[in-house]
Amino acid sequence: MKKLLASLLCVLSFQSFAIPVELNNAPVREFVSWYSKTTGKPVIISPDVKGEITVYSADVTKDELPQFFTSVLRANGFDLSPGNPAVVQKFNRNTYEYSDSFSEPVPASSYDGDVPPPTGDFFTKPEIRANLITQTYPVNNVRAKDLAPVIDIFLKGENIAGTKVYPLMGRIFLLVTASASQHKELAAFFPSVDVPRTQVLVESVIFETTASDGFDFSFAAGDPSGSPVAGGINTDRLTSVLSSTGGSFGIFNGNILGLSLKALETSSKSTLLSMPRILTMSGQPGTFTAGQNVPFVTGRVTGEAANVNNPFQTIERHDVGISLKVVPVVTPGGLLIMDVSTNADSISDSQTASDIITNTRSISTTVQLKSGQTVLLGGMVDNRESDSDSSVPWVSKIPLIGALFTSKSSNANKRTLYILIRARVVNLL
C-alpha cells in the first residue's frame, strides 16, 4: 500500500486558521478517518471503497472542510450519502446526481476547539512528507528481479517511507518510486550494480579406488617439469595419496581431467562414478544430481483390521546417488572462491534391518583457486563386507561327511572416494 505524504500544520486553533493539506497517493480510508475525527461526525466506509487520492496545497477553512471533503471524494469516484451516520461509497450515476446537500457547512460549535491531531503512520511520521516520483530504469546486464533487492536496500538508507521497487516488462526494467534526491543518487549508483556477471564452468570427475590400488596417476596430475602442486604434494607420483585412508587433497595447474580419465580406464580397480559439468554465474549455486528416487517406509497399519497380505504403508521418497553442488564467486582480483558440497549415497546389501539401508559419504568445504586450476578432494572410505555359503544339494545334509561338500567365504572391500574439480572463468565473446 502506498504511503501518504501529508503535511497538516494544524496544531493551533481551528477557529482562526485554515488547514494546509498536501496528500500524495494517500489511502482514501485514512483520509475519511481523518475527516471524521476532525469534524466529530461519524462516517461509515463501504467495503468497496479502496484506492489512493492526491491533493496539493489546499488551504481549507472550517467552513470549507465539508465541501472540500465531498469534492475530493467525487473527484476520485466516491460520494458521501446522507444519513445518520453518513456513508462513503462508490459513486453510482444511476442512483445519485451531484448535489451539495451532503456538504453544507458544519457549524463552528460542532468542533471541539483545536483540530484533533491526525492518526496513523501516513499522517504522523514526518519522514514521509517528501514528494515521491516514479521512474523506470532499464536493466541491461542482469535480471531485474535480481537487482531489485539491491536497489531497495539502497533506497532504505534514507528514512523516507513509501519507496518501492518493482521489476517490470519481462525482467528488463525496474519501476522505482522514490524522492527526487533519491533518484539523483540512484542514477549515479545504478551503473555500478548493473554490470555483467562472470560465468564459471565447473568440471568434475568423481571416482572410487580400492585401498590397495596402486595405479600410476602421476602423468595425469603432474606437469611436464614435474613441479610440485600447492600444499607440497609431489606430482611425480600420487599413488600414496590416492591409497591413503585419510583426507587427501591437492591443487594442480592445467587441465588434468582428460588425462585422469585415461588413468582410470587403465586401472581395473577403479570405478568412474560421475562426470558432472556445471556452468553457473558468479555467486549463483549450480547443482548436479544422478541416481534413484528410493521409497522408504515411514509407517504401517497394525492390528486386527490390517490386511496381512497387503498391509497399508506410508512411504517417503529420497534421492540416492551422486550429487554435487557448487557456489563459485569470482573476486575482483581474479581468484575463485568456491563452496563445494558433494554426496555419494548407495543402497546397502545388508539384510539386518527391516527396511532399506543407505551408505552415505559426503564432503562440504570451501576452496580458493585460480581460473583453470584443479583441486583433488578425497579420503571418504566405504567398507563393504559380504559372506557367502555354497553347498552341494542333499549331499551336504549327510551327517559327518556333509561338511566336506560345503564351503564358506567372506569378502572385504574397502573403497575410497575421490573428487577432481576444475573451475574456469568463462568470458563472453
Curated annotation (Swiss-Prot):
The chain crosses the membrane at residues 320-340. InterPro entries: Bact_Secretion_Sys_Channel, GspD-like_N0, GspD/PilQ, NolW-like, NolW-like_sf, T2SS/T3SS_dom, T2SS_GspD_CS. The keyword Signal applies. GO terms for biological process: protein secretion; viral extrusion. The keyword Flavoprotein does not apply. It is a single-pass type I membrane protein. Keywords: Host membrane, Membrane, Signal, Transmembrane, Transmembrane helix, Viral extrusion, Viral release from host cell. GO terms for cellular component: host cell membrane; membrane. Gene3D superfamilies: 3.30.1370.120. Residues 1-18 form the signal peptide. It is found in: Host membrane. Homomultimer. The channel is composed of 14 G4P subunits that confer a barrel-like structure. Interacts with G1P; this interaction results in a complex that spans the inner an outer host membranes. Acts in the assembly and extrusion of the bacteriophage by forming a channel across the host outer membrane. This channel is just large enough to allow a newly synthesized phage particle to pass through. Extrusion is a process of concomitant assembly and secretion and takes place at specific assembly sites where host inner and outer membranes are in close contacts. Belongs to the inovirus G4P protein family. This is Virion export protein. It comes from Escherichia phage If1. The gene is IV.
